Design a protein with these regions (language model features):
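A flexible loop/linker signature enriched in serine peptidases of the S9 family
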Residues: 22-35, 48-56, 67-90, 98, ...
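The serine-hydrolase catalytic nucleophile loop
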Residues: 444-461, 613-614
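Active-site-proximal cap/loop segments of hydrolase catalytic domains
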Residues: 441, 461-464, 474-665
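Hydrophobic beta-strand positions that form the internal "hydrophobic ladder"
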Residues: 18, 66, 121, 217, ...
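Non-catalytic accessory segments flanking enzyme active sites
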Residues: 8-10, 122-124, 131-133, 149-156, ...
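Residue-level detector of Asp-centered blade-edge/turn motifs that repeat once per structural unit
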Residues: 13-14, 61-62, 116-117, 212-213, ...
Length: 665
């Protein structure tokens, strides 16, 4: 649990250096550190920043600066409390030294991007309230929250670097934008010196992509309240480099991401990740796809359509070629995209991630891991040969000193004859052994897949379970990505029952093949893995114990309480009043009279992805039935358990104890 995880990378324009962002637990401070590291050929890897709150590094186009976000306070601003510290954009020299704030005002940055010539940075931030609105709220509404009205859209600002740097050193007072009449676009509030308003949106701006000549800015929107209620909140817009009225380019049911311009400024490339909707027709949770759009006409073309796996990140090489990460089965590899074609490039056996190209060189940064090898950052000098890697980092070396579990893929037939694949992770030295106690560990998503990649944290502790003597079965049930659209769409509208049959068929096959001891079976998962765990303990008494986290036990209240309302409705064929039968028949709660399995529950106290109330409801059901159980509430934690590392540590510690306790009975 004491691992350093790589959260981001940025490659210098000439590929001579790289910045790497990491997250690591700070056990004494009860939080996670976020730091930046610099790699150069001469000096190797060394710390670049030490504040513990630095993320999302981006090199300037000329290589002179690195911009990043941080909630550190500018010098002299000691009055900022821990609860109101905004994320600002900061600048630091590649050679290190003191970081300088791009602005001092309390603007909480959502995203940022460098201007192509490096003279400015585009920033999106929530529009400040006008003084008039602040007074009106205080006088008329007191402490009453108006549910929808409380949200404000974003401003897209252009902040010139030269005056910002001068201001960071001199620390003058903020610039006051003159008050505007009611209804005017510009707020009466403090904006940074040298900032110009490019656009004002009624929604949040999630990505910014300036055209190569700087004359146009593409940006991607998302809901201001961060709840997925309507795919129309996710669209691509175009605005002039000096401002103007934004033009909407896309009108579809997909959630676009990863905007990138072609070098000639003709195309805007983008991705739609797995389970993020569809460009073509009605909303469907298909696999990840790649597209390019004519910036003038808005016409969209799909790329790499011959690939039947799931695309993720991509990068554009200086010569215009596109490379993409594609998940196929249990591994992610690199593919060269040429129209409809997707050609797999030579690769190491394992999982590639975090693809990023240099602006002025052919080199790539990638991350790579296997089940037994922690993820590291590598430099690829020839993009056509990603199997030839130069290792830049060596985080988490302790794993090389320990006995490692072995693994193998495993395939079986479901109840309807569908072939399903998963992964078996054996205790160290036990590969191929039979009659082992088995823990079925179900991945979340459901649009995801388990395979040959490293995991050692509160969410993915499969190798830890294997090291504690469990054969770990990780099924890629229907709804998983990397196995074709038909396989992924097979989950709808039977959200838990169909994948549940896939998983139970896998357990039966492993017992029949002699791998698993039928008297020593356990099950668990988090998020959608929790959904499935909750469901399967109503369908069978095979399992001696269950460990579940952040899994819905019913769907009607969760539809109203979570932040993925639209997707919930798609999976179940409509909103609760449109398909009430499925909302009941696919919910574990309505079959809880069948539950006999001792169950360990975990829930973040502030989770909105799967409402905390789902855990409370399930606990009450188990209590009323007299089923042995325990319920751990992790205060302040959302779905990702990213506030306090002790919460994740205690979660896994207690889950392992629960499995051991009931395996021995």
């Amino acid at each position: 649990m004491n691992t350093t995880e790589i959260t981001g990378t940025s490659l210098a324009p000439d590929a001579s250096a790289a910045v790497i962002a990491t997250e690591a637990p700070d056990w004494k401070a009860n939080n996670f550190r976020h730091d930046l590291w610099m790699w150069t050929e001469k000096a190797g890897l060394s710390p670049l920043t030490r504040s513990g709150t630095d993320e999302r590094p981006q090199w300037s186009p000329d290589g002179k600066w690195i911009a990043f976000t941080s909630d550190r306070s500018p010098s002299g601003d000691s009055g900022e409390s821990d609860t109101d510290k905004p994320n600002r954009v900061w600048l630091i020299s590649p050679s290190g030294g003191e970081a300088l704030p791009l602005y001092r005002e309390k603007l909480d940055v959502h995203t940022f991007a460098w201007a192509p010539d490096g003279s400015a940075i585009y920033v999106s931030a929530k529009a400040p309230q006008t003084h008039e609105d602040e007074d009106r709220q205080s006088d008329e509404w007191k402490d009453v929250v108006r549910w929808r009205e409380q949200y404000r859209g974003d401003l897209l600002l252009k902040i010139s670097i030269a005056p910002a740097l001068a201001r960071a050193v001199a620390m003058p007072l903020a610039k006051e934008i003159p008050g505007k009449a009611a209804g005017d676009a510009e707020p009466s509030a403090k904006l940074p010196e040298g900032a110009s308003m490019i656009a004002k949106a009624d929604v949040s701006i999630a990505e910014i992509a300036p055209a190569p000549d700087g004359k146009q800015i593409a940006f991607l929107t998302e809901p201001i309240h961060k709840r997925i209620e309507n795919p129309a909140d996710y669209e691509v817009f175009l605005v002039g480099g000096d401002g103007g009225t934004p033009k909407q380019l896309t009108h579809n049911t997909a959630m676009e991401s990863h905007l990138r311009w072609s070098r000639d400024g003709h195309w805007i490339h983008f991705a739609v990740n797995a389970a993020n909707g569809s460009i073509e027709g009605k909303y469907r949770d298909v696999q990840g796809r790649l597209f390019r759009m004519d910036a003038s006409s808005g016409k969209i073309e799909r790329l790499g359509s011959s690939f039947d796996g799931s695309f993720d990140l991509f990068t554009l090489l200086p010569d215009g070629r596109e490379l993409a990460l594609g998940l196929k089965g249990t591994e992610d590899h690199l593919y060269l995209i040429d129209g409809d074609k997707a050609t797999r490039l030579p690769a190491m056996a394992g999982t590639y991630a975090g693809l990023e190209g240099a602006h002025n060189a052919d080199s790539l940064l990638v991350r790579f891991s296997t089940i037994n090898d922690p993820q590291q950052v590598y430099l690829v000098s020839n993009p056509m040969q990603p199997n030839k890697l130069k290792k830049l980092t060596n985080f988490n070396p302790v794993f090389a000193e320990r006995a490692q579990p072995d693994w193998q893929p495993y395939t079986w037939k479901s109840d309807d004859g569908q072939s399903v694949e998963g992964v078996l992770i054996f205790p160290p030295g036990k590969k191929g052994a039979k009659h082992l106690r088995m823990f079925t560990f179900i991945h979340g998503g459901p649009a995801d897949a388990d395979g040959n990649l490293f995991g050692a944290n509160w969410y993915d502790w499969a190798t830890l379970a294997a090291s504690n003597g469990w054969l770990v079965f990780r099924p890629n049930y229907r709804g998983s990505s990397g196995y074709g659209d038909e396989f992924m769409l097979g989950i709808e509208p039977h959200l838990v029952s169909k994948p549940g049959r896939d998983i139970l068929a896998g357990v039966d096959a492993l017992v029949k093949d002699g791998y698993a001891d039928p008297d020593h079976l356990a099950i668990g998962g988090y998020s959608y893995g929790g959904y499935m765990t909750n469901w399967l303990i109503t369908q069978t008494t095979l399992f001696k114990s269950a460990v579940t986290g952040a899994g819905a036990v019913e769907h009607a209240a969760n539809w109203g309480n979570d932040d993925m309302t639209w997707d919930d409705a798609w999976y179940l064929g409509g909103r609760p009043w449109e398909n009430p039968q499925l909302y009941q028949s696919e919910a574990a709660l309505f079959q809880f009279d069948k539950v006999k399995t001792p169950t360990h529950l975990v829930q973040g106290g502030s989770d909105v992805r799967v409402s905390y109330l789902e855990g409370e409801t399930m606990e009450r059901a188990l209590q009323s039935l007299g089923i042995p159980h325990t319920f751990l509430v992790l205060p302040g934690e959302g779905h990702g358990l990213d506030k306090n590392p002790w919460h994740g540590y205690i979660k896994v510690r207690e889950e392992l104890k629960w499995l051991e306790k009931y395996d021995k009975q």
